[in-house]
Amino acid sequence: MSDSVILALGIAAFTVIVLVLVAIILFAKSKLVDSGDITIDINDDPEKAITLPAGGKLLGALASKGIFVSSACGGGGSCGQCIVKVKNGGGEILPTELSHINKREAKEGYRLACQVNVKGNMEVELPEEIFGVKKWECTVISNDNKATFIKELKLAIPEGEEVPFRAGGYIQIEAEPHVVNYKDFDIPEEYHEDWDKYDLWRYVSKVDEHIIRAYSMASYPEEKGIIMLNVRIATPPPRQPDAPPGQMSSYIWSLKAGDKVTISGPFGEFFAKETDAEMVFIGGGAGMAPMRSHIFDQLKRLHSKRKMSFWYGARSKREIFYQEDFDQLQAENDNFVWHVALSDALPEDNWTGYTGFIHNVLYENYLKNHEAPEDCEYYMCGPPVMNAAVIKMLKDLGVEDENILLDDFGG
């Protein structure tokens, strides 16, 4: 057999092998890679069914059709908010979901929408209130410091639009890839001391992807045409100075009047109960936001006659905000009082009010001698340490879980 024949046979054999491998790959791709359109049936309602190309996650698939499921972490699987019921399709539950979904819930079909792959036709069940969630492009009215590490972001809703939220609710705010230099922040001179002390100006936040985070609203329903947030800058902890700063808080702090911001909502479950029970509000830091929303709503819109008090913890006098507003509400409403406790008062504060941590102040100066603390409703929002301390104190007083309402976003 000549060399040319051997060469030709070799080339032919190689070509056949390549073609076989290509055929195998294409077959595998047809089985493993999502392709074609699929249908997601929602709430057994043909009018709610959506059709779209296979691929991606359920959270994104729903959002692409204008159905916005709450996800404070932006689909990272860490917040556990995007729980939906998958009745058919979606595959097996993933290990990443089990920290948010117990065995009973998993058996009933509950899943994290951000973790469910959309590969074929599905049947899901969503809360009806989700269909009232919309998306808006808002305009920044102002973005001012209210404390050393807290800004009040005020957004204008598009003219003619309305965000039909309830007091205690929240919205999600979005940001595209960006770079934020802390040295460019507009911070009044009175707050520079701590920024200089910890050299916070050196930080840079670089974000390479679209992000979404949730923030409780400080505004209340009667404040028409605006959304107001209290946003604490998430700087790296002192023990980890080289850790990256908070992505969304850095972005929000960089916003200036006239900038455009995309939000979606309303969401929420931190709502006031419709009872006559006494209301005790406990807040700290940016946890002020839902406290303001609730208290303003109760006293200004509902004209509630329920007995209520507000206990707010701050480091020093400089960290107190909305003081004039709450002083006025206290003067105008016999059923409302509010108190501030400073945990680290400065000499120049000349502070004569309560000092210490707010859970201790609340207990020693009110609940210890309250005739029935277990009958009150407690609404709280603040740093995790504060929340844990308050909950323990309330449990020790015999308060049942149903009367302890916690907003995890504000701190």
Swiss-Prot record:
The record's listing under InterPro entries reads: 2Fe-2S_ferredoxin-like_sf, 2Fe-2S_ferredoxin-type, Beta-grasp_dom_sf, Cbr1-like_FAD-bd_dom, FAD-bd_FR_type, Flavoprot_Pyr_Nucl_cyt_Rdtase, FNR_nucleotide-bd, NqrF
Q: Which residues bind [2Fe-2S] cluster?
A: C73, C79, C82, C114
Q: Transmembrane stretches, by residue range?
A: 5-25
Q: Which reaction does it catalyse?
A: a ubiquinone + n Na(+)(in) + NADH + H(+) = a ubiquinol + n Na(+)(out) + NAD(+)
Query: A Pfam family for this UniProt protein?
Result: Fer2
Q: Where is the FAD-binding FR-type domain?
A: 133-273
Its needed co-factors are: [2Fe-2S] cluster; FAD
- GO annotations of cellular component type: plasma membrane
Any idea where this protein resides?
A: Cell inner membrane
Q: Domain 2Fe-2S ferredoxin-type, which positions?
A: 36-130
- Specify the domain of life of the species encoding this protein: Bacteria
On assembly, the entry states: Composed of six subunits; NqrA, NqrB, NqrC, NqrD, NqrE and NqrF.
So what does this one do?
NQR complex catalyzes the reduction of ubiquinone-1 to ubiquinol by two successive reactions, coupled with the transport of Na(+) ions from the cytoplasm to the periplasm. The first step is catalyzed by NqrF, which accepts electrons from NADH and reduces ubiquinone-1 to ubisemiquinone by a one-electron transfer pathway.
Instruction: Tell me the HAMAP family matching this sequence.
Output: NqrF
Similarity section = Belongs to the NqrF family.
List the protein's name: Na(+)-translocating NADH-quinone reductase subunit F
Species per Swiss-Prot/TrEMBL record = Haemophilus influenzae (strain PittGG)
Q: Which gene encodes it?
A: nqrF
